[in-house]
Amino acid sequence: MIIHNEDIKELTAEIPDGHKHLRTMMVLQDGKEFVFQEATIANLVRAYIMVKTHPVKRKVTLKGKSFSERKDGYAEWQLVEEE
């Protein structure tokens, strides 16, 4: 599925009451709704910036990985750059 700008009816980014992290909701013209957690958007932005600003890199792939040992405040499930 490729989502074009004209496919999007509304995009809302907010920190819901009682939460600490950003949620982003995308509503498409056909009524479908997608809600993204902050970490998902952060990873999307991270990958975008890595490719857009790198002088030769044209692709980056982030793969999901579970970490049993991690720094405080970090989620067990992380998207990490594929080597």
Stretch-by-stretch model annotation:
Residues 2-32:
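N-terminal acidic leader/helix
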Residues 34-71:
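Acidic, low-complexity, intrinsically disordered interaction modules
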